[in-house]
Swiss-Prot record:
Single GO term (MF): structural constituent of ribosome
Keyword Ribonucleoprotein part of the UniProt annotation: yes
Keywords (A to Z) from UniProt: Ribonucleoprotein, Ribosomal protein, RNA-binding, rRNA-binding
Full protein name: Small ribosomal subunit protein bS18
Complex formation: Part of the 30S ribosomal subunit. Forms a tight heterodimer with protein bS6.
High-level lineage: Bacteria, Pseudomonadati, Pseudomonadota, Gammaproteobacteria, Chromatiales
GO terms of biological process kind: translation
Matching InterPro entries: Ribosomal_bS18, Ribosomal_bS18_CS, Ribosomal_bS18_sf
Length: 74
C-alpha cells in the first residue's frame, strides 16, 4: 500500500515574526478566505490559535468596513 506523505503545516505568521495581523492588509486576508467568503479553519491552514483569533477579528473588521465582501458574487 502506498503511504501518503502529508506536508507538515506551519504557521506563516510565526515564521515571519508577525506581531499583529492588520485588517488593512487585504492580500494576506484573502489567502485565508474561501471563494465563497468563509474564513478557512486553522486545522486546514496550520495557523496557531493566537493568530487565528487575530485573523478572524481582522477579517470581520475588514468586512464591516466593506474592504472584504461577506459572501461571493452572485
Amino acid at each position: 500500500m502506498a503511504r501518503f506523505f502529508r506536508r507538515r503545516k506551519f504557521c506563516r505568521f510565526t515564521a515571519e515574526g508577525v506581531k499583529e495581523i492588520d485588517y488593512k492588509d487585504l492580500a494576506t486576508l484573502k489567502d485565508y478566505i474561501t471563494e465563497t467568503g468563509k474564513i478557512v479553519p486553522s486545522r486546514i491552514t496550520g495557523t496557531k490559535a493566537k493568530y487565528q483569533r487575530q485573523l478572524s477579528r481582522a477579517v470581520k473588521r475588514a468586512r464591516y468596513l466593506a474592504l472584504l465582501p461577506y459572501c461571493d458574487r452572485h
